[in-house]
Amino acid sequence: MRELVVLGTASQVPTRTRNHNGYFLGWDGQGLLFDPGEGTQRQMIHAGVAAGDITRICLTHVHGDHCFGLPGVLSRMALDGVEHPVHLHYPATGDQVVRALIAVSAPGVDLRLHPHAGSGPVAEGLEIRPLKHRIETYGYLLTEPDGRTFLPDRLKAAGIQGRDVGRLQRQGTMGAVSVADVSIPRPGQRFGFIMDTAPCPGAEELADGTDLLVTESTFSDDDGGLAQQYLHLTAGQAGELAASGKSRTLVLTHFSSRYGDDATFLAGQARARAPGTTVIAAKDLDRIPVPRRRQPVGESARPATAIGLKHDGSS
């Protein structure tokens, strides 16, 4: 199952109903924790996310509201006896801060450090793009390998059924019939994660073609001057980003405490700029599924296991 669990939605200052940042993405047996701010360990308990579910931790940058929850999370993993390797991705210029946070954590986690810079793959299916903030910041893009969708009508016409469908999928051909003859391309799902940034090319690349896009929306459109001063997005700019990338679902978060606990008006500002996108103003402990790829129009279809392209990168 592919699902986003929102652990916190505040920006620099938490509120009575909004914890600091924190986002857990369950993705086919992987568990990616993004930007754990203060209190993330407790929010995980409320959300039912176990420390052992985490396989990767991804930091966009080392401002405190995006990383000060790291010691608590690592200490809980050590307490729970998590044995699998945990990969930690973060900007290389934040290495001193990250190592200090690790130093005050309980030992015992098999933690693999992956400082990064530039743009491109950092793990299989996981890429980064630079953003525009006051310190070095990166967004993340998680992609599923492209696959194909088998069409039952074409399979029937080719005389392929039952176990032969799986055999064709594995082998690529059966006699004169190829996978391409009885299926159509199915682009893999895409998840984009964009935190503190002003509008920039990297953000546009991360948003492009996403099924689920999580982006900061620190300020209202009425406070565009503050967004420009501090290099953040307004709700309307987040909507424009989703519209330019044809994102299917936009999740707004990282709200300034100046707006209180109701961020629905920010969703309205974003929705006005992205009429073709589902816009959600996130609340703490929301669970948001990654939208399934739409079935082809005009032909009955059933999904096949992904075949084909994979991203290469070090783990």
Language-model regions, residue ranges each:
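Active-site metal-binding motif and surrounding structural segment of the metallo-beta-lactamase
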Residues: 38-89, 113-119
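Conserved beta-strand hairpin/beta-sheet module of binuclear metal-dependent hydrolase folds
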Residues: 1-47, 83, 140-142, 183-194, ...
